[in-house]
Design a protein with these regions (language model features):
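C-terminal beta-sandwich/jelly-roll accessory domains of carbohydrate-active enzymes
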Residues: 290-361
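Active-site-proximal loop/turn and secondary-structure-junction residues that shape catalytic pockets
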Residues: 38-44, 106-110, 153-157
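Active-site groove signature of glycoside hydrolases
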Residues: 84-118
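Catalytic cores of secreted or luminal carbohydrate-active enzymes
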Residues: 211-262
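Aromatic-lined carbohydrate-binding/catalytic grooves of carbohydrate-active enzymes
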Residues: 1-87, 96, 101
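Carbohydrate-binding surface patches
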Residues: 263-307
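Conserved, mostly hydrophobic/aromatic
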Residues: 27, 85, 149, 217, ...
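Glycan-recognition surfaces
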Residues: 44-45, 49-83, 127-230
Length: 361
């Protein structure tokens, strides 16, 4: 049950008679890769692990224990606990080498601050605990260097550059409302690169279109946490095309140079872009958030282009059977013009987005 599962990382045969291998096989037959979501640093009080090793959890002796989300944090300063947590991941990957992705979650802060292992060295707990986590992650990375892992911690609570040595991406926030995400992703990108920022299309804020939600997520590492049954035929087609476009352009988006053009904190719109290092390809994102009545719409001035090159402008990520109303669409401009004069891409529509591809000719 949910009250006693954390810590006991064993397959429930009554629920999964074929175990994880059957899930991996089923996913493969459906044409997708299989990923798994784990929270190996935590333990529930009614788990077999806690009953066998109560001294493996961080908790105060002779005090009433406070349970956050009915869980405790394992004491990663303890080498035996490090071995256990490594073993959780190692066993899964050893038995299921085709597992293609790990989401590593951490949903509780450290409470009941006391390490049974450190005894009279309690002042070292926070430091030794974090070092223990990184020791585990290094062992995993050394043995399984090609398995991508996402770090999630109640959202983005544990994002740091040391973690980037071991994780391929961060879950920026549990808030996936696309309007809020514009602000979150704008701020997050001040510190971390786009390729480290997970951004998923979800059901939050259904007042916004699937296109808008997808265009917001596609400015980072695009993903979907959305049931296909929630989408109509046109929306499914749109998502398929948007994923194809993102996949085609992801080298520019994830590895190109990022330019923040219009901040959402300064008004009712947002825009940023990515340009390839050779300046031959760029992707421009524009978002209308909550335009005011009669608001003057200013052109978006691009950056990072070659002033002497000519660029073909093309709006992509369009809904089926719709046409672009972008005045610059399918036209060619010099990089100098695009950076000094710009493109009239903003509109007076609420929660409206454009994705624009620029190609040097």
């Amino acid at each position: 049950t949910a009250a006693d599962d954390l810590g006991d990382w064993e397959v429930m045969k009554s629920k999964l008679p074929g175990g994880i291998p059957a899930l991996v096989k089923s996913a493969k037959e459906a044409g997708v890769k299989f990923g798994i979501w784990i929270e190996p640093e935590m333990v529930n009080p009614k788990s077999d692990l806690f009953e066998k090793h109560p001294d493996w959890a961080i908790h105060l002796p002779n005090r009433e224990t406070y349970y956050y989300r009915n869980q405790l944090v394992l004491d990663l300063s303890n080498p035996k606990v490090q071995d256990f947590v490594f073993g959780v991941v190692d066993n899964i990957l050893t038995e299921n080498p085709e597992v293609a992705f790990f989401k590593w979650d951490c949903n509780s802060p450290i409470t009941n601050i006391y390490s049974p292992y450190l005894k009279d060295k309690q002042g070292q707990l926070y430091i030794d605990h974090v070092r223990g986590i990184y020791n585990v992650l290094k062992r995993i990375k050394d043995k399984y260097p090609n398995v991508p892992m996402m770090l999630c911690s109640g959202g983005g609570a544990r994002c740091d550059y040391e973690a980037l040595k071991y994780y391929t991406e961060f879950w920026c926030s549990d808030n996936t409302d696309p309007i809020e995400r514009l602000f979150i992703q704008w701020g997050f990108s001040q510190i971390f690169p786009a390729k480290a920022m997970c951004a998923h299309v979800t059901s939050w804020n259904k007042n916004t279109s699937v296109k808008f939600r997808t265009d917001v997520a596609s400015m980072c590492k695009l993903g979907f946490d959305l049931g296909l049954k929630e989408l109509n035929a046109d929306e499914q087609t749109y998502c398929q095309n948007a994923v194809a476009n993102w996949t085609r352009l992801k080298k520019v988006i994830l590895d190109g140079d990022q330019y923040r053009l219009v901040s959402p904190y300064d008004g009712n719109h947002m825009s940023l872009m990515y340009a390839s290092p050779d300046k031959n390809k760029a992707v421009l994102y524009t978002y209308d958030i909550h335009p005011r009545f009669g608001e003057k719409l200013l052109p978006v001035k691009l950056q990072g282009l070659d002033a002497k090159k000519m660029y073909k402008v093309k709006e992509i990520n369009l809904m089926p059977n719709s046409k672009s109303n972008l005045a610059a669409n399918e036209k060619t401009y010099s990089g100098d013009y695009l950076m000094k004069v710009g493109i009239n891409a903003f509109t007076t529509n609420q929660a409206f987005s454009r994705v624009i591809e620029l190609t040097a000719e």
